[in-house]
Amino acid sequence: MKILLTNDDGVQGLGMLKLAEYLKDKYKVTVVAPEKERSAISHAITLHKPLRLKKVKEEDSLKIYAINGTPSDCVKLGIEVVLREKPDIVISGINEGLNLGTDILYSGTVSAAIEAAIYGIPAIAVSRAETADIEDRRIYKFLENLIEKVLEKGLPKNTLLNVNIPDFKKGIKGVKATILGKSIYIETFQKNYDPRGKEYYWMAGKISEIEKDERTDIVSVKEGYISITPIHFDLTEYNMINILNSWDIKIE
């Protein structure tokens, strides 16, 4: 079995490298990751400069490459150039920091898994609480079990899994299938000036609404569950199709 691993934390991302080392005893693992951190870049791809591929490490069952691109670039290049065939599964992560609710729309981690789903490849995006112990082998055993289930059962077309792992030290209640919550922020921008007197802004902000629906990934992780959310990239609101047609919008 061949696994393609990527992330948005960069090729030195500890979570991804630890997972690669764990999986290499059972699978052929190829890592293709950004050469530097590309967090919150969503599904961006590189069109206006060349992509450069660098081999970082090569063993019998583990190869690591870095590219000067985005997480989605990594999946494309990994499939088309490095592997030259589709892997059995693509794993994006383990990301340092959770990817919950509508925050996934900004996530390079989740977008890399979406890119794999566009290719028709089973994919899992994995994120962990920043306080979670990256050395805890239970994290990797859980992911190994999940990978085996996905390879055995398959996933529906255009569907991937978004997994969020809380801090095991605080106690884990179990694994829970969830829906996406809503992450609503009050956006603020901190204004400052550079040494030449030109203004610039830092984006800040805070959560304005606390999600309370127990079915959601946000609440489930907060309560101590590993959250698995099935998501797909078809953003169509099908219930709106007939409504739009009924508007009878004229061209002239």
Curated annotation (Swiss-Prot):
Keywords of this entry: Cytoplasm, Hydrolase, Metal-binding, Nucleotide-binding
InterPro entries referenced in this protein's UniProt entry, alphabetically: SurE, SurE-like_Pase/nucleotidase, SurE-like_sf
Catalyzed reactions per annotation: a ribonucleoside 5'-phosphate + H2O = a ribonucleoside + phosphate
Note describing how the cofactor binds: Binds 1 divalent metal cation per subunit.
Listed cofactors: a divalent metal cation
Domain of life where this protein originates: Bacteria
One term under GO cellular component: cytoplasm
Cellular compartment(s): Cytoplasm
Secretion signal, residue range per the UniProt entry: none
Molecular function via GO: 3'-nucleotidase activity; 5'-nucleotidase activity; exopolyphosphatase activity; metal ion binding; nucleotide binding
Entry's EC annotation: 3.1.3.5
Amino acids binding a divalent metal cation: 8-9, 39, 95
PANTHER family: 5'-NUCLEOTIDASE SURE (PTHR30457), 5'_3'-NUCLEOTIDASE SURE (PTHR30457:SF12)
Function per UniProt: Nucleotidase that shows phosphatase activity on nucleoside 5'-monophosphates.
Family: Belongs to the SurE nucleotidase family.
Protein name: 5'-nucleotidase SurE
